[in-house]
Amino acid sequence: MARQPLIAGNWKMNLNHLEAIALVQKIAFSLPEKYFAKVEVAVIPPFTDIRSVQTLIDGDKLLLKHGAQDVSEHESGAYTGEVSGPMLAKLGCSYVVVGHSERREHHAETDEVVNRKVRAVLKHGMSPILCVGEPLEVREAGGHVEHSTTQLINALKGLKTEQIRQVVVAYEPVWAIGTGKVATAADAQEVCAALRTALADKYGKEIADEVRVLYGGSVKSSNIGELIGQNDVDGALVGGASLNGDEFTKLSAMAAGGPLP
């Protein structure tokens, strides 16, 4: 089946709620409506911006989706600083990024923690954007495919086959995040294809063919065309470029198959 490309802008810890409103307006009103039928575009702001973004998208009936950068594995309770799945669902989030390499590195998130967070997202009707990917030393040793597929399968343990349809996978080689280095289109295709094969082996080809696999790591308008032209790359998880309205809009338009008018 044809998979609709997804361009998701991960703002990380950037932009206050006023800056968020300005950026969402710029993206929504710069990208021609016809492109939204060809590519799904989502913004992933910090927690403090989500309500403002939701209000703008809902109030102006914008075609953008929005999501969150993380979720607690817990439903509620004495977990100071945590934000739960039910809270994010009430904020209208379509997506929640789970297992980003920065969470794995700076917050010591294991595959087991990531698995519990994936479950928390799915339980409340949202789609996890599940991040997997290798550090430079693993890439240089030739273990990048095994590393990434192992992370994937571990993060999906215990899920029902039907739940897998709701998962978005993002391959983000750690050495390419925020470094200016980018995996070649062939590099991205190699791992994204391997991830889809791993899904097919575990859950069947029909399910695997429905799951969108994104690439993340120094994605720009100058390389999105070649990346998304690969058979198993279904879009991008965009970092730094998503903070620039003009660049993110151009990137999204190119993913839809056409330049800005």
Swiss-Prot record:
Q: Which GO terms describe its cellular component?
A: cytosol
Which HAMAP family does its entry note?
TIM_B
Report keywords, A-Z. Answer: Cytoplasm, Gluconeogenesis, Glycolysis, Isomerase
The record's comment on protein family reads:
Belongs to the triosephosphate isomerase family.
User: Whose protein is this, by species?
Assistant: Saccharopolyspora erythraea (strain ATCC 11635 / DSM 40517 / JCM 4748 / NBRC 13426 / NCIMB 8594 / NRRL 2338)
Pathway linked to the protein? Carbohydrate biosynthesis; gluconeogenesis; Carbohydrate degradation; glycolysis; D-glyceraldehyde 3-phosphate from glycerone phosphate: step 1/1
Q: Which GO terms describe its molecular function?
A: triose-phosphate isomerase activity
Spell out the catalytic residues.
Answer: 100 (electrophile), 172 (proton acceptor)
Single biological process term from Gene Ontology: glyceraldehyde-3-phosphate biosynthetic process
What function does the entry list? Involved in the gluconeogenesis. Catalyzes stereospecifically the conversion of dihydroxyacetone phosphate (DHAP) to D-glyceraldehyde-3-phosphate (G3P).
- Record's subcellular location: Cytoplasm
Q: What does the subunit comment say? A: Homodimer.
Do you know which CDD domains this protein is assigned to?
Answer: TIM
Q: Which reaction does it catalyse?
A: D-glyceraldehyde 3-phosphate = dihydroxyacetone phosphate
Enzyme class, one word?
Answer: isomerase
The protein's name is Triosephosphate isomerase
Show the InterPro entries listed in the entry: Aldolase_TIM, TIM_sf, TrioseP_Isoase_bac/euk, Triosephosphate_isomerase, Triosephosphate_isomerase_AS
E.C. designation(s): 5.3.1.1
Q: Which amino acids does the record list as binding substrate?
A: 10-12, 178, 218, 239-240
